[in-house]
Design a protein with these regions (language model features):
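Short glycine/serine/threonine-rich phosphate/pyrophosphate-binding segments
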Residues: 24-25, 137, 153-155, 195, ...
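A conserved regulatory-domain signal marking ACT and ACT-like small-molecule sensing domains
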Residues: 1-93
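ADP-ribose/adenylate-binding Rossmann-like module
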Residues: 210-213, 337-391
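Glycine/serine-rich phosphate-binding loop and adjoining beta1-alpha1 elements at the start
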Residues: 81-264
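A short, aliphatic-rich alpha-helical micro-motif
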Residues: 203, 261, 329-330, 350-353, ...
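Adenosine-phosphate binding glycine-rich loop
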Residues: 233, 237-238, 257-263, 363-412
């Protein structure tokens, strides 16, 4: 079985004090390597007489591997491990975003325009013409990132507090890649009625609503109701952002493999928000055959345990009524699209696919099959992770989509 590679997501920083004698640094580097760590960076030396002080960044495989590297360093003669920390957790301390001002307040004139009395004039202008709120307030460039934490990445229903790091990351990416001010709002709301009511009350503050990590089937109802009731764009990124980047990746993959959209047989693993939306966009793109699978197996017309979203999927896909497990329906398929969970498929499944198979294993944080396991078996191999080549992630779509929507004051 392929060894899980080291990654920045599990990297650590080692703050070390070394005896200032030849060979000490070499022994330290060797110990890290023998423990399976991959040195990512060496900070500059701080020479203090008979001692050297430096920080070393080491990429590890997982948290257990982090501890193995730490213990290897601690056991070295002539090296003292002063401190160490997980770089991912360190990045998240106190959050990843903060609020900045865009207007100066250098004197009384500035203050009188930014706040009272001058602000009252702007308030009344908006009162007389509410559309001016998109010009004279943060609505012009601000999106609410709303989640109830019921379907976070591949982690599941982990709650609103635990969803916050993802939503903060989303806000960071909105700003970095689209210049959009996104604000994370994680709410303690379980039902569709609660989420809809909250967002409707919140809407006057924002120029758009990005729904995120809300479980199916509630997410479908929530988006439909909000689109009908609000006059600003409402976008469920798990559905449409993922669908957009999947179709883009498939178009490019066809250029490599020489296959045609209308001839494809596509298997989609995962019938939540993303899987259903991907199916819909592939239907519109003209894909020849689509078979969806959930935990029970293939989705087909006549299956008795389907919710409304899956029922629609059954009626509009899988014309041959293929049945069985994910492995069964992957026989002869051209494309595998995974939006489910880790380790779902094997190398044997890829061998059973059609010639030059296209594999999109997009489960996060861990894919349905790792690229190392698919090496030499797939014509195109992609994941949803940013530390592998060929990333298919909605971060490639949502900043630009909202940038455009805000710029034209879109209402849908």
């Amino acid at each position: 079985m392929a060894t899980t590679p080291t990654a920045a997501a599990f990297s650590i920083t080692l703050d070390c004090r070394l005896d200032n004698v030849p060979g000490t640094l070499g022994r330290l580097a060797l110990a890290i390597g023998e423990a399976g760590g991959n040195i990512g960076a060496l900070d500059g030396f701080d020479v203090r007489g008979p001692e050297l002080r430096r920080c070393i960044v080491v990429h590890c495989r997982d948290e257990a591997h982090q501890q193995k590297v730490v213990e290897a360093v601690r056991s070295l003669k002539g090296v003292t491990l002063v401190d160490w920390w997980d770089r991912t957790f360190r990045m998240h301390e106190a959050g990843k975003i903060h609020v900045l001002t865009s207007a100066p307040v250098n004197d009384r004139d500035d203050l009188s325009m930014a706040y009272t009395p001058g602000v009252a004039r702007v308030c009344m202008a908006i009162h007389n013409d509410p559309s001016l709120s998109h010009r004279y307030t943060i609505r012009k460039n601000t999106v609410a990132i709303v989640s109830n934490g019921t379907a976070v990445l591949g982690l599941g229903d982990i709650g609103p507090e635990a969803a916050m790091p993802v939503m903060e990351g989303k806000a960071l990416l909105f700003k970095e890649f689209g210049g959009v001010d996104g604000f994370p709002i994680c709410i303690n709301a379980r039902t569709a009625d609660e989420v809809v009511d909250f967002v409707e009350r919140l809407a006057p503050t924002f120029g758009g609503i990005n729904l995120e990590d809300i479980k199916a089937p509630e997410c479908f109802e929530i988006e439909e109701r909000l689109k009908a009731s609000l006059d600003i764009p409402v976008f469920h990124d798990d559905q449409h952002g993922t669908a957009v980047v999947t179709l883009a990746a498939l178009w490019n993959s066809l250029k490599i493999t020489g296959k045609k959209m209308e001839d494809l047989s596509v298997v989609i693993a995962g019938m939540g928000a993303a899987g259903v939306a991907i199916g819909k966009i592939l239907i519109n793109a003209g894909v020849g055959e689509i078979v969806g699978c959930d935990r029970t197996g293939a989705i087909y017309a006549g299956r008795s345990d389907l919710n409304a979203a899956k029922q629609w999927f059954a009626e509009n896909t899988n014309p041959s009524r293929k049945m069985g497990s994910i492995s069964d329906v992957m026989h002869g398929a051209d494309v595998f699209v995974g939006v489910s969970g880790p380790g779902l498929i094997t190398a044997a499944d890829l061998r059973n696919m059609a010639k030059a198979p296209i594999v999109f294993a997009m489960a996060n944080p861990d894919p349905e099959i790792r690229p190392e396991q698919a090496d030499g078996l797939a014509a195109v191999m992609a994941t949803g992770r940013s530390d592998y080549p060929n990333q298919i992630n909605n971060v490639l779509a949502f900043p630009g989509l909202f940038r455009g929507a805000l710029d034209v004051n879109a209402t849908d």
